Each structure stands twice: as structure tokens, then as C-alpha cells.
């Protein structure tokens, strides 16, 4: 399975876990690709930080009003953008690649406004991180 497909599987697992109010292991069995499970697990581990960033940069939209699938996409994108070191493998995706993957996932599975919304938030986080460096 390609990394893009593994990212999308992690997004869907997080989305289903939220909707069904079940542990991650139920929508995503442990025998899936290691990257997929690790990505979803790390998103949950870092969720308070990721959600704080989403709240900060989505000034006109409270976190609770953002569609659950879009929240999952944002969380995965933010994790890969900010914490690539927590994921398995030596081929971390560059920041711009993480944003592109999130936007492409939104184009495929969300409404018309979602890709630009996701791009705006992830781009703002990246610009803020660059200016802090």
C-alpha cells in the first residue's frame, strides 16, 4: 500500500473512531501497515496539541463546528508537519508534501470548501513555524 493510501486509511480510522466512539483498534485492526497504525496512534497521542493549533488558526470556526472528517485530515497533516520524528521509517515527508497530501485527501472526500480551508490552516502553521526558526 502506498503512503498516500496509508495516510487516508489513518484518516478514515480516526474519523470512524470518533463517529462510533470506539477505540482506534476497532476501526483499524493492528495487522494493518505499521505506518497507518502508528500515524493514527500518534495523532491521538498528540491530539490536544493538534486541536489547540486548529483552534488558534481557524479563528472563524470553533473546533466543534469543523466536520469530523476535516478535523481528522487536519490532525494527520499537522502531525506529519510538526512531528515527523514520531513516525516509523526514514523517509519523512517534507512539510509542503504533508500539506499537499492533506489537501488532496480533502479534495477527494470532502466538500468544495474543505481543501482551501485545510490548506489555509496548515499553511499558516507552517509559516508560523518557519518564522519562529
Predicted features by range, described:
Residues 1-115, 119-133:
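N-terminal interaction/assembly modules
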Amino acid at each position: 500500500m502506498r503512503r498516500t493510501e496509508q495516510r487516508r486509511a489513518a484518516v478514515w480510522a480516526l474519523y470512524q473512531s470518533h463517529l462510533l466512539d470506539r477505540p482506534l483498534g476497532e476501526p483499524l485492526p493492528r495487522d494493518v501497515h505499521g505506518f497507518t497504525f502508528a500515524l493514527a496512534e500518534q495523532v491521538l497521542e498528540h491530539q490536544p496539541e493538534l486541536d489547540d493549533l486548529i483552534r488558534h488558526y481557524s479563528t472563524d470556526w470553533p473546533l466543534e463546528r469543523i466536520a469530523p472528517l476535516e478535523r481528522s485530515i487536519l490532525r494527520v497533516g499537522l502531525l506529519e508537519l510538526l512531528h515527523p520524528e514520531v513516525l516509523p521509517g526514514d523517509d519523512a515527508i517534507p512539510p509542503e508534501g504533508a500539506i499537499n497530501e492533506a489537501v488532496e485527501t480533502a479534495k477527494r472526500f470532502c466538500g468544495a470548501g474543505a481543501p482551501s480551508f485545510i490548506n489555509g490552516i496548515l499553511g499558516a502553521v507552517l509559516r508560523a513555524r518557519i518564522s519562529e526558526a
